[in-house]
Amino acid sequence: MASCEVVITGLGIVSPLGIGREAVWERLRAGQSGVRRIPYLVEAGFPVTIGAAVEGFDPRQYVANRKSLKVMARDAQLAVAAAVLACRDAGIAGAVDPDRLGVLLGADRISNPLETCEPTYRACVIEGRFDYRRWGAEGLAATFPLTFLTVLPNMAASHVSIALDARGPSNTLHHGDVSGLLAVVEAARILQRGTADVMVAGGTSSQFTPFDWARHWIMGRLSRREEDPAAAMRPFDASRDGEVRGEGAAAVVLETLTHAQARGARILARVLGWASAYCPPPQQPTDPGLARAIRTALEHAGLEPSEIGLVSAQGAATVDDDMREAHALA
């Protein structure tokens, strides 16, 4: 079974706390927060003006083909950066056959920025009202031809594969908040099946358009605690009142143990066990699926709960979500 063991040898992070794992770790240790006021939300008069944005990010530092930036949503740009950083961290340049290098990413829904949608909207408006009958002719004619390529969830993985010259397995998982974790799991399975020697896996999301903010506000999921942005989101706290929207991407380099040892790689972690399960609708007070997934993952890893040193909970900071998660962890 040693040849089937999967290890992690590289990590790349692009987050509101910084770019690169060293920067993020230092700010975590210092107790810093990536939540702050978002200028365009303040200017637009949104009822919620705080968020966690990635600052100081220049995609041109990570995307070699500058022309491709025109058809890359921010989600894809963040994903490419995280993947490039992970591969640098792992030192796999020239150490892996491109045909045996794969990519698997978890992706979120992608919304077009307002500047892309505005020409289409204006072409369909008559006396202040959107006329759907004009969409097929005037609306499409005013739309940038490659717009739809930017919002396809699988485009992030495609751009990462191109950036890394990864010619092995490539796929995208779109399962909400667990997409990135499931991508890591499926990447490990691909390695164990012998289809690849190295996989780059992770997740990316940038829900920072006005459409995204408005949707989550209407759903009642956003914290209204504006006076102290850093303390607005309070997972599992009695005073929690909602989440804070953010953006970011993370990627890990996974390898079979034999491949990592053969090239003298630094091993950061081992992938021991995993599980997933169906979760009931969010209106339910408990989540037996989450509890079952936790138990099954421990069994798969051959571990007891007492052997776990860290639980990385979702901690959505909504009243119902935190209650269901706390019940499952108990």
Predicted features by range, described:
Residues 6-8, 100-104, 196-201, 233, ...:
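Short glycine-aspartate micro-motif
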Residues 1-2, 94-97, 140-141, 149, ...:
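Solvent-exposed alpha-helices and their adjacent loops that cap or buttress functional pockets
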Residues 125-143, 185, 189, 193, ...:
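Glycine-/small-residue-rich "gating" segment that lines the acyl/pantetheine channel
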